């Protein structure tokens, strides 16, 4: 394989495939990494940038060297893998709780090791990228890089669609590296890389023997605890139990029956259960003679486990219809009305914490989602939430939101005898008519509702964050990460003899701005079409396709810089003035066209700006490295959404592009080569 274009496509495909693999695989084994999930993304960008720098000094080293830190990473992760139903104790800060009396602790040393080894592995895999970028005209190189990235996204999306295990993922990575091997005498680095990747495959085989299943979202383990009921753990966390309704101990999970006890004379002809899981909520509804149940579950593998293993076989009942979809998206699509709408245990089983990344249920616990549930109630219908909410302020927040949506505070049933209290929250016309509250139930006072934390909205969909802000542990971790990145980049540049004048502030800021713009697009489409894995994969592919379109335009027509910036700021203004909620129109085809125009137009013009500058650069590899390192800092800036929300993130993006324009005018360092 000698054609540089082919090698560039394969290198870029390998990098993006590996990045997605690590982002998907590591949190499935070490659940607390999921709370720092974009740290893996940031480390990946850092590693790619460092790899490009190092290739200036050692262009002869192939990508196999990245397999050595990858093996160390896999060994570290497996040796600290969380299986939380097994009693374990580790030192560190208590970070999340997931069931009665259990807690998981963050091992800071392991988290730091993960970041270090991800960076090292991605740097190794990126070593061929610098010479390949420098071997052809910049725009030609960039187009083949994007083609490879699209191939990497498509490959991993296909594996997710097929519910393949990590063994297949790592095997495909090995195949990608194998086809990049040059036909020449193997070096020591190549030999060690071969051996390391072989060891990775061996560890994946041993892990496969254990029998875990992998859905598009989770590592799933089916096990039998001491109480005898089959149970499901996701990413090592006990998640669901499959009890026969007739044998279920109501003191263990008391919330299932409460709405039926609250309204004993009411018949529910049609029920909607969002978060139906393996089927227990549905089985309980059927046991209370609910006429028909629409069971909505986002994870197809968990639902299939329920079909095969739930002792009551609720999904085999002709009264039950199953939909595999995001709950919010189902509410948007359906025109049906229901006598009972239940948001079952749809939120993740964690203590209050924050990440810059959306969770699967983020848009299900907003005022707009509660209003959508209300609008799908038949006359006299009831809306119910239940879960282990753990924090009183979270219950108060939901009470305030339901008061805003339904016009009266809900009825609440708590079970304080549990180590982590379970709570049932009910609203709707029949519930509002109950006065006074029955024994065991309560209705929050006006003062309690008024003092509750601010409601979550589609712009700030962060129910587990009490107040806007970034928690101290994230500030400390991000600071340490940036210091590590600064030292590593400076050291790598010095080792590779890359002069400071090769660094581009213009491309650095463009990278940070584009990462935030991409984040905003993903959030928009998650709201409009659901937080499913395939929506995200399609959005990423569409973003990359819009990049290719910009390259094609720039190759055939040298777009004036003023035109590119005017289009960019004009479309950013439109995106800011038309928030995603304004695009919630029917039919879905029209919604898709509007959303695509609003979300992808700024991306197109942003890439006209980038490609217009990139075609002028004298050092394509250094400019690309600057851009990738800027994207790493964009991953840090993403946490600003925890404070200002996702709509105002557009203003941050606009400010960064203004800064990029200024750096192009000032022409410091490598930006001297740019046209004014």
Language model segments and positions:
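Alpha-helical transmembrane segments of multi-pass membrane proteins
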Residues: 1-676
């Amino acid at each position: 394989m000698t054609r540089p274009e082919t090698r560039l496509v394969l290198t870029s495909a390998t990098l993006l495939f590996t990045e997605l693999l690590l982002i998907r695989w590591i949190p499935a084994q070490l659940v607390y990494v999921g709370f720092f999930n974009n740290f893996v993304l940031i480390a990946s960008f850092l590693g790619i940038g460092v790899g490009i720098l190092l290739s200036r000094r050692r262009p002869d080293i192939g990508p196999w060297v990245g397999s050595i830190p990858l093996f160390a990473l896999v060994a570290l992760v497996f040796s600290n893998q969380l299986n939380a139903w097994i009693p374990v104790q580790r030192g560190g800060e208590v970070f999340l709780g997931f069931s009665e009396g259990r807690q998981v602790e963050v091992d800071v040393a392991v988290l730091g090791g993960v970041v270090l080894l991800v960076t090292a592995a991605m740097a190794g895999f990126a070593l061929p990228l610098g010479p390949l970028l420098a071997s052809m005209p910049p725009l030609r190189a960039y187009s083949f890089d994007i083609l490879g990235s699209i191939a990497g996204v498509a490959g991993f999306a296909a594996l997710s669609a097929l519910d393949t295990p990590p063994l297949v993922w790592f095997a495909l990575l090995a195949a990608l590296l194998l086809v990049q091997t040059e036909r020449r005498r193997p070096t020591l680095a190549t030999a060690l890389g071969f051996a390391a990747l072989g060891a990775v495959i061996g560890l994946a085989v041993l892990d496969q023997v254990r029998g875990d299943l992998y859905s598009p979202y989770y590592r799933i383990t089916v096990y039998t605890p001491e109480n005898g009921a089959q149970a499901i753990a996701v990413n090592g966390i006990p998640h669901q139990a499959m009890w026969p309704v007739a044998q279920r101990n109501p003191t263990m999970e008391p919330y299932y029956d409460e709405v039926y006890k609250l309204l004993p004379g009411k018949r529910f002809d049609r029920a909607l259960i969002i978060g139906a899981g393996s089927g227990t909520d549905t089985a309980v509804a059927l046991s209370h003679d609910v006429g028909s149940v629409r069971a909505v579950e986002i994870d197809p593998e968990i639902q299939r486990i329920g079909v095969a293993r739930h002792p009551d076989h609720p999904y085999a009942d002709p009264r039950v219809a199953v939909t595999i979809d995001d709950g919010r998206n189902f509410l948007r699509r359906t025109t049906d009305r229901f006598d009972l709408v239940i948001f079952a245990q749809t939120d993740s089983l964690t203590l209050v914490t924050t990440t810059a990344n959306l969770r699967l249920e983020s848009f299900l616990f907003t005022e707009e989602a509660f209003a959508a549930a209300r609008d799908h109630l038949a006359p006299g219908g009831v809306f119910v939430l239940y879960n282990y909410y753990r924090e009183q302020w979270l219950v108060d927040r939901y009470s305030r939101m339901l008061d805003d949506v339904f016009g009266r505070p809900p009825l609440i049933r708590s079970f304080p005898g549990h180590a982590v209290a379970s709570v049932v929250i009910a609203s709707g016309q029949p519930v509002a008519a109950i006065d006074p509250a029955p024994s065991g139930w309560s209705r929050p006072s006006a003062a309690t509702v008024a003092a509750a934390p601010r409601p979550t909205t589609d712009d700030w969909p962060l129910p587990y964050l009490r107040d806007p802000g970034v928690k101290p542990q994230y500030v400390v971790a991000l600071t340490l990460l940036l210091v590590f990145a600064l030292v590593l980049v400076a050291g790598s540049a010095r080792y590779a003899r890359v002069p400071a004048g090769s660094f581009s502030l213009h491309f650095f800021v463009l990278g940070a701005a584009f990462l935030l713009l991409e984040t905003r697009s993903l959030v928009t489409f998650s709201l409009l079409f659901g937080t499913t894995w395939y929506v995200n994969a399609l959005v990423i592919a569409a973003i990359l396709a819009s990049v290719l379109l910009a390259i094609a335009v720039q190759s055939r027509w040298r777009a004036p810089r003023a035109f590119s910036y005017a289009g960019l700021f004009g479309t950013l203004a439109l995106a800011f003035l038309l928030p995603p909620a304004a695009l919630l129109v029917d039919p879905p085809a029209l919604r898709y066209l509007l959303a695509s125009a609003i979300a992808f137009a700024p991306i197109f013009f942003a890439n006209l700006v980038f490609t217009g500058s990139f075609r002028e650069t004298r050092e394509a590899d250094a400019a690309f490295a600057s851009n990738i390192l800027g994207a790493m800092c964009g991953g840090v800036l993403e946490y600003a959404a925890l404070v200002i929300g996702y709509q105002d993130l557009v203003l941050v993006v606009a400010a960064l592009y203004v800064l990029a324009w200024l750096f192009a005018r000032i022409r410091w360092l490598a930006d001297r080569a740019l046209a004014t």
